[in-house]
């Protein structure tokens, strides 16, 4: 990459960082990237609604169809203060580096457009990576266009700048969101005996999940509590509903199934002891 394109790519990354948008709302991000690629390359651009791809057609009669993918969405987190390109979107930032992914793919679009390639290339700008929705939708392009190879990368700290790291086998864990919903009966705070408070059963379940992670599944699985919701700052009322959200991770899906079974079985028992109803939901399932 020449110096001029490198400097432009860095500016693109900064602008993407500044206009960060959450999953499913990557409107400005998508428009910005489509406009840039239309101005700076000769690639064909196909708008697919929530996402888009740019296409380079090779003159090689033996060309394969390959895909190179980047994700566009930011995270619902406040940005780091003190940088000149800080996100202008309240509560949203590119703390996972997707601004860099898109900027790099933009730079690659420019290079392939100028220098050509021996294969047909689909440059895929994916929405909704953090929620999983975008990956499922964009994956349909693989069969639709008979794509033979798909490539992507992720920035990773701790390695020397400019290093490309490859690994045989699994690189990222499978992941699954487990939502535990408990329903009891609300009551006035002065008469807790009239109600059924889910707080205690949820607390026991959360502690059990941590115990499983640290003992039975140590090194094989993670059970990270990412959310707890039970009542609020209403000191005259005891809650009748509550939930806990736990992210399960492992390199083996069978291990995720096992730890999920252990947690849900414990939650059922804890809920029964407190006179509660309990249900479970899965979200953000990544095989």
Question: Language-model segments: which ranges?
Answer:
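Metal-dependent amide/peptide-bond hydrolase catalytic core
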Residues: 203-287
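Acidic/His- and Gly-rich active-site-bordering loop/insert found
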Residues: 1-94, 103, 111-119
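Structural signature of FAD isoalloxazine-binding scaffolds in flavoprotein oxidoreductases
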Residues: 69, 104, 152, 241
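N-terminal hydrophobic/helix-forming segments and targeting peptides
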Residues: 1-20, 31, 35-38, 110, ...
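Short, small-residue-enriched loops and turns at beta-alpha junctions
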Residues: 19-24, 75, 131, 232-235, ...
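Histidine/acidic-residue-rich, glycine-tolerant segments that coordinate divalent metal ions
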Residues: 75, 83-93, 99-100, 115-228, ...
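Active-site beta-loop-alpha junctions enriched in small/polar residues
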Residues: 21, 71-73, 128, 156, ...
């Amino acid at each position: 990459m020449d110096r001029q394109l490198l400097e432009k790519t860095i500016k693109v990354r900064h602008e993407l960082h500044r206009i960060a948008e959450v999953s499913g709302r990557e409107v400005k991000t998508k428009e910005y990237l489509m406009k840039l690629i239309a101005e700076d390359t000769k690639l064909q651009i196909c708008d697919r609604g929530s996402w888009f791809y740019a296409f380079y057609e090779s003159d090689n009669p033996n060309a394969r169809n390959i895909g190179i993918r980047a994700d566009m969405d930011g995270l619902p987190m406040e940005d780091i203060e003190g940088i000149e390109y800080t996100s202008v979107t309240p509560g949203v930032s590119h703390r996972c580096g997707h601004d860099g992914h898109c900027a790099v793919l933009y730079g690659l679009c420019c290079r392939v457009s100028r220098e050509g390639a021996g294969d047909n290339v689909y440059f895929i700008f994916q929405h909704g990576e953090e929620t999983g929705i975008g990956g499922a939708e964009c994956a349909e392009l693989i069969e639709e266009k008979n794509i033979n190879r798909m490539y992507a990368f992720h920035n990773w700290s701790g390695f020397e700048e400019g290093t490309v790291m490859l690994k045989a086998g699994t690189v990222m864990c499978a992941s699954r969101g487990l939502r535990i919903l408990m329903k009891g009966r609300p009551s006035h705070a002065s008469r807790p005996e009239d109600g059924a408070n889910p707080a205690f059963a949820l607390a026991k379940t959360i502690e059990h999940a941590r115990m499983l992670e640290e003992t039975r599944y140590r090194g094989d699985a993670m059970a990270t509590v990412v959310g707890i919701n039970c009542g609020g700052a209403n000191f005259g009322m005891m809650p009748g509903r509550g939930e806990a959200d736990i992210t399960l991770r492992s390199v083996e899906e069978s291990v995720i199934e096992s730890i999920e079974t252990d947690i849900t079985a414990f939650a059922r028992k804890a809920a029964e002891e407190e006179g509660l109803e309990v249900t479970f939901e899965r979200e953000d399932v990544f095989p």
